[in-house]
Amino acid sequence: MVFSAMMASLLGGSKPARAQTIAGSVPEVDRVSIRVAVDSYQFAVAAGKKVGPVDIQHFGWGLSDDKPPSRTLISEFGLSMHAESKRGSETRNLLMDFGFTPEALTNNISLLAIDPSELDALVLSHGHYDHFGGLVGFLQKNKGELKAKLPFYIGGEECFCSREWVGPPVRGNFGALDRQVLEQAKLTVTYAEGPSLVGDHAFTTGQIGLRSFEKVLSPSTMKVGVDDGIGCYPDKLPQEERTKAAIPDQFRHELATAYNLKGRGLVILTACSHRGVVNTIKQAQAASGVTKVHAVIGGFHLAPFAEDYVRQTIAALKEMEVDYVIPLHCSGEVFYELAKAEMPTKLLRSYTGTRFVFEGAGA
């Protein structure tokens, strides 16, 4: 009773929502464009091009004819992606992850002309600061601009746990997602532990199963419990985690977001792939019933792994016949260089501000 009352108080007088589970086939969209709002790399003079049916648009400097530039895109070790999808006359927009700092996120979405008032959903892939650090500032900057009761999708209560970074070469406090800020912004916190629809165009994978050779590294630990409203409620965690003070992060709460593109297959936004990019793809396939993968974009979390492991991942991606592979964030230079040699026609380069437009067959 006390727990329920506390949750109701923190979440605007109602219990957290449950996402709409997938019943039958997933929606099919005619077009989806993915804009990298925040990432680690920037190259202002990269030339746009078309690779097969994929239109690649780089932002450049955003120059105008009448006045000199006063700012530019900000890159940092964080990730945020904006997705716009079309199905017939319908258009849907979502923002997945929020970068490391609000300065980068708010600056970049302004320059990239991403309109927060048009967002139909927010998705947080997992509870690491480099994916939610810009959220509070984004919500404060756009107070009153977002749609009423805007859904905020998460993969479970673990998203709210306070974390310590323990992976070399650094250690320290890695922050916590503040649920009270979400309540103040009048977001509808929506738990999507299982495969779920997002904005009736996209779907989340739900929690990602371990279906391949891939290993889960644990660069962070989770503190179990709530202190002054910050943290995760033990009652909402898996049974084996409830009585522990701190536990290695296994990222059971991590999820990916995907689209079923007409006549092409899945376009999968992986975020960070702590549970493996191959496992993430397999989870999206299982969630949707669609086996063909047109593109996978996001962090693949291969930077910490040895070359042999990276090669094994590339071999698996080739075996799965993914049309296009777009590494971001934590994928690592070793992966990029090896993939460039092993699958040069499938590997696409991205920078902060790059937009990938995927057209359905027959468009």
Model-flagged regions — what are they?
Residues 115, 189-198:
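Short acidic low-complexity segments
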Residues 68-77, 85-121, 136-137, 144, ...:
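Pre-active-site segment of Zn-dependent metallo-hydrolases
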Residues 96, 198-207, 267-270:
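Short hydrophobic-aromatic micro-motifs
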Residues 121, 128-132, 151, 236-356:
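Cap/insert and terminal regions of metallo-dependent hydrolase folds
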Residues 120, 125-193, 206-217, 318-324:
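Active-site HxH/HxHxD metal-binding segment of metal-dependent hydrolases
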Residues 3-90, 204-253, 261:
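Zn-dependent metallo-beta-lactamase
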Residues 82-84, 197, 258-260, 357:
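Short, well-ordered beta-strand micro-motif
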Residues 83, 97, 109, 126, ...:
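Divalent metal-coordination and catalytic microenvironments
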